[in-house]
Amino acid sequence: AQVAVLNAMRDALPGSVMVGDSTQPIYAGNLFYDHDHPGGWFNAATGYGALGYGIPAAIGAAIAAPERPVICIVGDGGAQFSLPEVMTAVDENLPITFVIWNNQGYREIATSMQDVGVAVIGCDPTPPNFAATALSFGIPHVSAADDPAEIAAAITKNQGQGPCIVEITAPVFAPAED
């Protein structure tokens, strides 16, 4: 499901730059996803937990390549590290689609802890209300379910009109055992 969603986003916005944070879909993408052009896929999901990287990196990508749509893929946990930076995208009117995968916590970290038999502690922070956050930023918020076509439609809805937040609220990227 993770790669199917990444493929749907790529196909919905060809030539885009997809920037990622340390999230399960990005880790899966690093293994199984092919972007449509060199330099169009980059992230900090290299095993060192660089949470908070995605939002400012997407802003940099949008400034560096204004002719390309930018999609930022970040989890709800990672978004909390740099969420105020979305206001920079607002101030600069950057056409970035911030895709926030809201699985109610640090699922990548929790899964890793479970895999090695460590008690899962500190992996369930309460996420902000991203619809209210988008409203306070003065940008659109779109909710999407776990259907790749619905997610593709959501990311194109406000394309080219400044930043927006697309929140995936269903556990689309949850491990199979969840």
Residue ranges and their predicted role:
Residues 1-61:
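Active-site diphosphate/adenylate-binding microenvironment
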Residues 13-16, 37-40, 65-70, 92-97, ...:
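Short coil/turn connectors at secondary-structure junctions
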Residues 26-27, 49-51, 79-80, 104-108, ...:
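Short gly/pro/ser/thr-enriched loop/turn and capping motifs at secondary-structure boundaries
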Residues 28-34, 54-56, 83-85, 108-113, ...:
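Short acidic, glycine/serine/threonine-rich loops at helix termini
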Residues 62, 88, 133:
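Hydrophobic/aromatic ligand-binding patch that stacks against planar heteroaromatic rings
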Residues 67-154:
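Conserved thiamine diphosphate
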Residues 148-178:
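Glycine/aspartate-rich loop-and-adjacent alpha/beta segment that forms the canonical ThDP
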